[in-house]
Swiss-Prot record:
Cofactor(s) in the UniProt record: Mg(2+); Mn(2+); Ca(2+)
Coiled-coil regions listed in the entry: none
Binding sites annotated in the UniProt record for Mg(2+) 1: 435, 508
GO terms under biological process: DNA topological change; DNA-templated DNA replication
Cofactor binding notes: Binds two Mg(2+) per subunit. The magnesium ions form salt bridges with both the protein and the DNA. Can also accept other divalent metal cations, such as Mn(2+) or Ca(2+).
Residues that coordinate or bind Mg(2+) 2: 508, 510
Protein name as it appears in the record: DNA gyrase subunit B
Reactions catalysed: ATP-dependent breakage, passage and rejoining of double-stranded DNA
Residues under site feature: Interaction with DNA: 460, 463
Listed SUPFAM superfamilies: ATPase domain of HSP90 chaperone/DNA topoisomerase II/histidine kinase (SSF55874), Ribosomal protein S5 domain 2-like (SSF54211), Type II DNA topoisomerase (SSF56719)
Pfam family, one: HATPase_c
Record lineage: Bacteria, Bacillati, Bacillota, Bacilli, Bacillales
Amino acid sequence: MVTALSDVNNTDNYGAGQIQVLEGLEAVRKRPGMYIGSTSERGLHHLVWEIVDNSIDEALAGYANKIEVVIEKDNWIKVTDNGRGIPVDIQEKMGRPAVEVILTVLHAGGKFGGGGYKVSGGLHGVGSSVVNALSQDLEVYVHRNETIYHQAYKKGVPQFDLKEVGTTDKTGTVIRFKADGEIFTETTVYNYETLQQRIRELAFLNKGIQITLRDERDEENVREDSYHYEGGIKSYVELLNENKEPIHDEPIYIHQSKDDIEVEIAIQYNSGYATNLLTYANNIHTYEGGTHEDGFKRALTRVLNSYGLSSKIMKEEKDRLSGEDTREGMTAIISIKHGDPQFEGQTKTKLGNSEVRQVVDKLFSEHFERFLYENPQVARTVVEKGIMAARARVAAKKAREVTRRKSALDVASLPGKLADCSSKSPEECEIFLVEGDSAGGSTKSGRDSRTQAILPLRGKILNVEKARLDRILNNNEIRQMITAFGTGIGGDFDLAKARYHKIVIMTDADVDGAHIRTLLLTFFYRFMRPLIEAGYVYIAQPPLYKLTQGKQKYYVYNDRELDKLKSELNPTPKWSIARYKGLGEMNADQLWETTMNPEHRALLQVKLEDAIEADQTFEMLMGDVVENRRQFIEDNAVYANLDF
């Protein structure tokens, strides 16, 4: 019946004694956001990760190698693994079977207390009990001791005692649940792509584990993807560099442990200028970095400088490379596993364990140094690339000074073309990046000057995918944006200094407008990515048509809407249609009413759901390999709607 269950006879003494009980579940249904972040679509998907994380823990401990996630009819989720099966013996303190305790008591699980798992994933670690509390129905089947055990729950409450329902020659756990619509009022429908992206990431981060995702909601169109990477994060780096030109064929790869900290690093340089560094701790993407990232950067800079000087590629001490120089054109992934990870930072995605810094530094520096001496040609290319980056950095320093604002209140240094807003509260302020001066004039007249700022952009901005920072900072339009935003750029970037929490790209609904949008998004992604990650970047949706019938005006945003409206309207009185070719054709009142008024407008928020997908798409659209770009356009032309 279940493909992911194990034939292996796991006899390790993972039993009820290793399940600790800390507190009850009463609060979970009252304040679900405290436990899963939110009750939005994101929180809904978080339920799946809590169950999958438990299966990954079994795999990390060496007891499972297959996990299967199925979206069943009516958006039930089924997660199956071939681990040892959750313990079913009586848990001493509670006097109930361990599986029931795990599913009904908050923080009761093998990951608390250190007896069950050396390393466990999951940001909240709140586990199965929270999923149970927030599900209208949940069922568990445990294959253990040659017996199949079963129990069912409603909103976290057991419906009957754990019972034996059959015999088995396999081991493992099956959990089925349906999220409670009373809690998840926004949606209880799962997004296949959201699940697929994280499952692929987990397969990269846990080499050798096979994770399968299947969607059975449409019987005639069952979809399935299975991921299994023996190369782990090495394969991940190769995928990220797929559309780039690597300087060395094989990624540099290290997988070692020291002081009970497991360190896995893969790094490959390419001929481009952007740095792509992804860091993970216990499978959690540490967006804000942390001590593992610090240790890696410190070792990388020290070893490259040491090699450059000793091999005489760099002549003197004053030629030393900065950290930023050594990372130009680098794609790297750092993944550590730690028994007690400490997460800090605004979003709890920054690793705080100080001991990790030294371990990563030591393990990586020894391995990297050996690689450089064994591959002198590659080593020379990497060092020389750093030297070129250093020269560009010196040139960029001058340009960068122009863009640095002394403080968010230093209005004197703001660009002359900027029509700023009067409010000094970034949370309510928004800036519209408007294509062309003529449209800029209309938007300035039609805005709410208290909270809306306008920055007209003249002509095309630079394609940053093909340029170094010094050239980028010499581009007038880019300099004006950096100064207006107040955040700095690249290594100097500080999200807390953002002067606006909404940055709205407002371009014409034509091919040129689409190109400018792409250029701006490429710049934000490569040099101001936290703006996208924080949800500050939006795309305005100006209307494409105005349909007039008598005194009635209708603004229409795409051809589909237009066809629908035409079919619904009476033929009399006669109506006329005007197509807007550009923002400049609208007067100030029309622009305000259709595109800028928060009461009526539609804004498209730019989200970064999949780092791999985004990186490859920007490289494909804006990079040097024409053939890949042509193929991408041919494959996606049918979906393209340049009118947004």
